[in-house]
Every structure is written in C-alpha cells, then in structure tokens.
Regions:
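Catalytic or ion-coupling anion/metal-binding cores of large enzyme and transporter domains
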Residues: 1-158, 163-183, 187-267
C-alpha cells in the first residue's frame, strides 16, 4: 500500500473503518513500531531484505512468462522462461531446440514412456507432445506429473514439452502449455505424429518465441487429426459443459466470458 501511495495510485482522502483516511492510516503504519520490528526480524532471523518481499516498481522483477506463436500454436502458447536452465541458453538468452516429436494423447502414457528403459522410452532431443489435454479433451488438467518426472529423468533437460494442457508454478524447463487452439478444437497440435520435425525458439530476454512444424507445411495441414484423440471418458458432465461453452465462446481468447448469442446459435 505504501508503494501504491508513493506512485499516486490511491485516493488518500477516502475514509476507512478506523475513522481515519487511507492516507492517515498509511502515514501511521509507515512510522509504527510494529512495522519496524517486523522488518528487523526479517533481516536478523531470516537474512531477508524486507524490500525484497514486496518490491518497489524500480526493483520489480521482469516478466517470467514468454508468449510463443507459430504454425503449431497459431493462437499462442506460454512458457515460464525463467525456469529454463541457464546452461540451455546461449549468450543472448536464446533457447533453441529442434527435434522429433514424440506424441502422447494422455499424461499417463507420457509418464510411462519417460520412465521406460525399453524401445518405447523417450529419447534425448525429443519434443514431448501432449495433445488432447485442453478443456475439451481432459478439462485442461495441470500436468504436474510429467514435469515432476522430467525433473528426475535422465533425458529431462534435453527435451522440450508442448501441450494444450496447463502447468503450475512448480514446472521447470522448456515446457510450453496452453497451446491454442487445443487439439480437439482443430488445433495443429492434433495433427502431429511421432518423428515429425519440430523447432522451438524462445528469447528469454525479449519474451517472444515460436513453436513450428518444420516439414512440408502444406501436407501437414491437410492431415487428419491423430487417431487416438478423443475426450477423456472420465470427465464429469459439468466439466464437459464448461469446456463446450468456453469453446463456443472463443476458446483461449474469448472463452472466459460466455458468448450467449453464439451458444444459443449452436444449440
């Protein structure tokens, strides 16, 4: 609140339940003994600079997320680019990975292949594709199990992940999620097959990137979707309804607000 005040973003004359204005409350808090003690404890007990907990704008972190586009994700995907290991970046902060697609239509199958020691195992240099895990396919689950497995798998740092599912804040590495359109909504991700050439380029400083199929694009776009793609039969009815409504309303870019007229038209 003090930072907001200092940047003129608060109505300091607004009354509060204390009987004082916001400005008066903040002036008291800024000089209060309680605040001073809290700041001292953080420094003396934990070795933490209080101004690193809630940072002022001049010390703000840069964005940690890169927006990626390309012929595999024409409506975009996102990656937590600050979670990519520094040794995977060049001197300009660029992550570049080119490799064959390894396509899975369920998280369970991907985990099994990551743990396998047989011929079906995921190889170093692969691009792990998790398709059909968006809202229509699986309710857009958090694919934590895959990223957790990657952390301990021998090939973990030497491959990339591209999916229409989502990731949590604990994801690490070049894991691109929210690929849009999702595979079951006709997205190109659903056309990929094992061995297809894929190129992922992420500029972690400019926060832009691309995810592309690098083979014959004309032939690729004519393909049927992956034969294994289908909605998860375990999806509850309310999740299926939500997925259908958000898809009718615009998917990734519009589905957060239902388009009532479009939904009625489709009904």
């Amino acid at each position: 609140m003090l930072h907001l005040r200092d940047h003129g973003l608060l109505e300091l004359d607004a009354p509060t339940v204390t009987g004082r204005t916001i400005g008066e409350n903040l002036a008291w808090w800024e000089q209060s003994e309680r605040r001073r003690l809290f700041r001292e404890k953080l420094t003396s007990l934990d070795g933490i600079d209080p101004d690193d907990v809630i940072r002022p704008p001049e010390k703000a972190f840069p964005s940690t997320v890169t927006f990626v586009q390309g012929n595999l994700v024409p409506e975009g995907a996102v990656v937590k680019s600050t979670a990519i290991a520094p040794e995977l970046l060049d001197e300009d902060g660029i992550f570049l990975h080119e490799g064959p697609a390894r396509v899975f239509v369920s998280e369970e199958a991907a985990i099994a292949a990551l743990k396998s020691t047989g011929e079906d195992r995921v190889q170093e240099g692969d691009v792990l594709i998790l398709a059909g895990l968006g809202p229509l396919g699986a309710g857009m689950p958090e694919t934590y199990q895959v990223t957790s497995t990657l952390r301990y798998a021998s090939v973990g740092k030497n491959l990339a992940v591209l999916t229409d599912a989502r990731f949590s804040g604990v994801s690490t590495g070049p894991c691109l999620g929210h690929a849009s359109p999702e595979a079951l909504a006709g997205g190109p991700l659903g056309k990929l097959r094992d061995g297809d050439p894929v190129r992922i380029h992420i500029d972690t400083r400019k926060l832009v990137g691309t995810a592309d199929f690098t083979g014959n694009l004309e032939e690729f776009l004519k393909r049927e979707t992956h034969p294994g793609l289908e909605p998860d039969p375990r999806l509850p009815a309310d999740t299926r309804l939500w997925a259908a409504l958000q898809n009718a309303s615009g998917g990734s870019w519009g589905g957060c607000v239902y388009d009532v007229e479009e939904i009625i038209k489709r009904l």
